[in-house]
Amino acid sequence: AIVSGGSSDLKVTLEVKTALEIYGITCETFIDVGVAGVHRLFSQLDKINEHNLIIVCAGMEGALATVIGGLLPQPIIGVPVSVGYGVSKDGMVALNSMLASCSPGIMVMNIDNGYGAAMAALRIIKS
C-alpha cells in the first residue's frame, strides 16, 4: 500500500506508484489520510492493514509514518516530502521526525525519494 498524508504529497506518491507499476507491481493508494484529519486514516486502516508492506509519503512534520508504524505490524518505508512552510525546512523536519520515530521498524528514504522507496519495496517483495 502507498499512503500519503495530503494532496501536497501526491507528486512523490505517484512517483512511487509509477515506479512499482513499471516493475509489474500493482498497489492500492490511500491519499489524504494524514494526521491532521486522523479520522480519515482510521476509516481506511482495515484496508491498509490488508497489505504486506506500507510506503508512507508525508511532508510537514512527517508524523504519519510513526502513527501507522504504531498501529500496524507491517514493514513501513517512510518517504519525507518537501512540502510545508516555515520550520518545515523543505522536508528536513519530516526526515528528522521519521528518523527519530519511536515506532520500531520504520525504514526512511531521503527527502522526495519516491523511486528509492519503490526500489526498496521491490527488493522486499522479491526476496
Report the location of each language-model feature.
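Structural motif
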Residues: 1, 26-28, 52-54, 74-78, ...
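Glycine-rich phosphate/diphosphate-binding loop of Rossmann-like nucleotide-binding domains
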Residues: 1-40
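C-terminal binding/interaction regions
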Residues: 4, 45-49, 53, 83, ...
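Short glycine/serine/threonine-rich phosphate/pyrophosphate-binding segments
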Residues: 9-14, 38, 58-68, 88, ...
